[in-house]
């Protein structure tokens, strides 16, 4: 069995109940009565299945273990392992695939009948990633990622937490000093407001 490294269902459920509470408060402000809201961990997880749930409900397709791979799009979720780290691809259209091939100097893949359209790429994705990896092996992670971004090829660097929270990174900006003790660092919510949220003890006389 495989377990998520964080309590994902709890986090999803907390977002669902927050939305329900805010909707109730808004309804009350508009003159309607509030409501009782109930959220379960299981239903929160089911509601987050997105395209996997749709694949089953439309075609009774039960997904197999496939890691980060997208079941209906390729190369989407495939990883390129390079000097300096790895990149995960999220190529969702033929034009993006063409740009990817051009950057890697492998334009012949674009016209290869095995990869001619998305359906073909999904069918032959194990062959495709071997071809892409072979074409990319002479590149470094950061230089290739810069090329992808400049040409509109969706991709991202795979980072460990040391790199996530490195100085100057978006992750570093998400870290705040806990105001109560002043010594603990925590990750703030990814929302910026025009005022500071009141913390415990702010109004203690």
Feature-to-residue mapping (PLM):
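Acyl-CoA thioester-binding alpha/beta core of soluble enzymes
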Residues: 47-205
